[in-house]
């Protein structure tokens, strides 16, 4: 079994099909649904000629769709490209052109930005709009219609040498794509999961045994539930808040509201019984502590008994 994110996720979906993989508000997806929806999106990507090492922009907010779209790119052995939704037109053009993106998933609220730059993106073959109540762009495919009108792509063997890439934030110069192999990156994330107690620590965690261990945990204990409070478009949110828990069969809870609302996070921790919270420094930690203190002083403290770890990085 190759050390590739798509392959590990597929094995997890087979092992624990009815366990929860994604939660965003009232929208809940099981591992079976997560895998099926990503496979249908992958069919659309292949119909436009995308495949191994094809780059796909993810111009999205934290959501189930962000993670489904990324999984679909992994399935075709492609390379998801994180797009900062705060970028202006010239920055978007630079990033999507520099990354050689051939497809772009975008949040519906950014339809106007896509409309204004699409003719300058000669390499992009298809735009895919995630519906958020914004009128559908004529030049774009509709996300949910793709899922309803396509069959799941058949699985195939991939390589652990396939590229995974993360673009830097561009705080010192223009954004740059940092490249990893799936095997190297996945191995590091899996070892981190072991260090956090999400999966038993071994001298070397064998990829072949991950889904077996995930099944055992689901039957004998409970699978992890993680909330990335920070954007998935950055490494901290994606790697620590989503990729690691999904490697070990856990659920990822995303907060649909833009900006950080500590009370929204704490209420979601209570509702979903989250075990892990991922934040970025004092910009998150201080408001979080203030909200906890206020709730305590008001006589309505939050129930955080489910929380094992709060991880801050970045």
What are the functions of these language-model segments?
Residues 18, 149-169, 173-174, 216-225:
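Conserved pre-ATP/AMP-binding loop-to-beta segment of ANL
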Residues 61-81, 85-89, 97-103, 224-225, ...:
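A short helix-loop-beta submotif of the ANL/AMP-binding
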Residues 61, 106-116, 132, 230, ...:
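Adenylate-forming
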Residues 30-32, 163-208:
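Conserved AMP-binding A3 loop
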Residues 18-63, 70, 88-93:
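Conserved AMP-binding/adenylate-forming core of the ANL superfamily
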Residues 47-48, 75-145:
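Structural core segment of the AMP-binding/adenylate-forming
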Residues 1-3, 135-162:
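Flexible, low-complexity linker/hinge segments
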Residues 186-229, 233-278, 291, 295-296:
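Conserved AMP-binding/adenylation subdomain of ANL enzymes
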């Amino acid at each position: 079994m190759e050390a590739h994110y798509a392959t590990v996720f597929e094995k997890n979906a087979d092992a624990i099909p009815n366990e929860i993989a994604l939660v965003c508000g009232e929208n809940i997806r099981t591992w079976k649904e997560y895998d099926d929806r990503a496979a249908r999106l992958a069919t659309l990507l292949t119909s436009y000629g995308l495949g191994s090492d094809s780059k796909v922009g993810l111009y999205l907010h934290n959501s189930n769709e962000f993670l489904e779209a990324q999984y679909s790119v992994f399935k075709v052995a492609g390379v998801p490209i994180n797009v900062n939704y705060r970028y202006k037109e010239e920055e978007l053009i630079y990033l999507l052109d520099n990354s050689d993106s051939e497809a772009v998933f975008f949040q519906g609220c950014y339809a106007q930005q896509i409309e204004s730059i699409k003719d300058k993106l000669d390499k992009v073959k298809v735009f895919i709009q995630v519906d958020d109540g914004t009128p559908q762009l004529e030049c774009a495919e509709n996300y949910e219609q793709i899922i309803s009108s396509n069959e799941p792509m058949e699985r195939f063997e991939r390589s652990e040498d396939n590229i995974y890439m993360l673009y830097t934030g561009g705080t010192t110069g223009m954004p740059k794509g940092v490249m990893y192999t799936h095997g190297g990156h996945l191995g590091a994330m899996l070892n981190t999961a072991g260090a956090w107690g999400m999966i038993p620590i071994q001298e070397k965690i064998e990829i072949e045994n991950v889904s077996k261990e995930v099944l055992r945990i689901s039957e004998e204990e409970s699978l992890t539930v993680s909330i990335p409070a920070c954007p998935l478009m950055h490494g901290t949110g994606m790697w620590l808040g989503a990729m690691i828990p999904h490697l070990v069969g856990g659920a990822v809870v995303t907060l649909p509201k833009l900006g950080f609302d500590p009370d929204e996070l704490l209420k979601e921790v209570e509702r979903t019984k989250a075990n892990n919270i991922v934040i970025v420094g004092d910009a998150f930690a201080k408001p979080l502590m203030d909200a906890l203190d206020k709730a305590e002083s008001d006589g309505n403290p939050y129930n955080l008994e489910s929380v094992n770890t709060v991880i801050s990085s970045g």
